[in-house]
Amino acid sequence: MQSERQKYIRNFSIVAHIDHGKSTLADRLIEATGTLTEREMDTQVLDNMDLEKERGITIKSQAVRLIYKRNTGEEYTLNLIDTPGHVDFNYEVSRSLAACEGAILVVDATQGIQAQTLANCYLALDNDLEIVPVINKIDLPSARPEEVKQEIEDVIGIEAEDAPLVSAKTGLNIKDALEAIVNKVPAPEGDEKAPLKALIFDSYYDSYKGVVCHIRVKEGTIKEGTEIKLMNTGKVYEVVEVGVFVPNYMPVDELKAGDVGYVTASIKNVRDARVGDTITEAKRSANEALSGYRPAVPMVFSGIYPVDGAKYEELKEALEKLQVNDAALSFEPETSIALGFGFRCGFLGLLHMDIIQERLEREFNLDIITTAPSVIYKITKTDGTLIELTNPTNMPSPSEIKLMEEPIVKSSIITPSDYVGAVMDLAQNRRGIFKDMQYLDTTRVSLNYEIPLNEIIYDFFDALKSRTRGYASFDYELIGYKDADLVKLDILLNADVVDALSMIVPRERAYAKGRNMAQKLKEIIPRQMFEIPIQAAVGAKIIARETIKAMRKDVLAKCYGGDISRKRKLLEKQKEGKKRMRQVGSVEVPQEAFMAVLKTEE
């Protein structure tokens, strides 16, 4: 059922490929509806982390309430929920979409449909949203709006004939976009008298208010003093404040079915208010939670260690603070012989990992060393137990392993047809299995591959961009596990295993990878006073070796002429000393060495 009030509400989000102008369009909508004065307008209002502005990406979902007056005098409340565009934050996007009834699909008029346009669009369709295509960047000379419209109709299969043609940069035709939202996005429904059901689509920690939950009320009413219960954790809290975003907080008396806003209830930790959870009243609970909740599952793991061992506690505090705001981040203490005490951290994907590392360095001024990222392998041992392996150092000996499985992703790559050969070559090199390909139009092709996650985890995206001159776009999702013949590759320096450099590789590639790493390390590790052998080993078998020659003083400099035995005595003495040093000497591994190991593909 729909109340009179709900008829004038529109909840929508904006989805797009990276850099197609989603956050800029959001800025223009905020400006056009007069939500912020020009003085308060800051480019990309909704991206409020420095890192988001710098990288030009949206990391956390944001929401803002716009009041739009039509020429007919009617006033509409538009709730815009800005979503992250990157594949790592797929779950956050899907929850933000579940809070809406419609989605604006922004497509760049110069580039047309890209891989993430499709991925996000399918997510929106999965949530039964009404999709409103908007074509952006029509002020550019290379814009081809008519072709792009045709493409949207052919590839996605939605009507795009009267799609608004806008330029978010110059503010051209923004009114058309607002009209399209009002006309096409359905108004919310839901009974205001029913038991409360509200979806948390984002939550973060504020040092004054505690955890602030961004919610979409689906049914019922929530106001200050209500006792609420989170359905997945079962915890009960009392509401301290409810309000709306303009983008800053503005407390209101109550939020009813159809509204988007925030609620604070002195919750101490984001983990207690998970994205996707359902809020209901403690006394008058809803029968079942809203569907679609799933705990965030990390896909990529990496070790993070302080460069200065004494900073361990500071690193722990920093990670805890980040975790308060980021429920997808997980970490547990681990020790490494080479690096001392640190943490094994789990991330949603590479971008997420990168962002966390950068925030640790930037917001907490920590110097950190990170080890090669790895994925979760499933190992069935000979005695039948199943273990999940996130750290290569913990891999059991080959005699105990019956079966080893690695995660596989389904990836779609959209590329100009000229580069199909290069892309296929790259995918095959990364153990990809070709599934199918389709032409989107005469110039662009979509290729679908199944590739082990381990192969794309580090530099697949960079390699793809460089082979296609930056034109290809890429999107992936995890589809399951598959058995694989994998071995653990160890690196020994001066006959000691450096545990932080161990990695899991396919058996047929172990030799090439080992040789490559040994050569790379030889270039990077500084020379010492004694000779250092660098060895790559699989099990007890050494498969590659390089030697860093010792620095030596010219002990014969003071012998002018003289007997050969005198010179020999001096050289023997030097050799003896170097031998002793090598027994007691230890090798410091510089941070660059860890990074270099990752980049051995080139």
Swiss-Prot record:
Residue positions binding GTP:
19-24, 136-139
Main subcellular location of this protein, as a coarse class: membrane
Q: Is Cell membrane given among the entry's keywords?
A: yes
UniProt-listed Pfam families: EFG_C (PF00679), GTP_EFTU (PF00009), GTP_EFTU_D2 (PF03144), LepA_C (PF06421)
Q: What is its EC number?
A: 3.6.5.n1
List the SUPFAM superfamilies hit by this protein, alphabetically. Answer: EF-G C-terminal domain-like, P-loop containing nucleoside triphosphate hydrolases
Q: Where in the cell does this protein reside? A: Cell membrane
In which domain of life is the source organism classified?
Bacteria
Biological process GO terms, please? positive regulation of translation
Q: Which reaction does it catalyse?
A: GTP + H2O = GDP + phosphate + H(+)
Q: Which family does it belong to?
A: Belongs to the TRAFAC class translation factor GTPase superfamily. Classic translation factor GTPase family. LepA subfamily.
Entry protein name: Elongation factor 4
Q: Which organism is it from?
A: Clostridium botulinum (strain Langeland / NCTC 10281 / Type F)
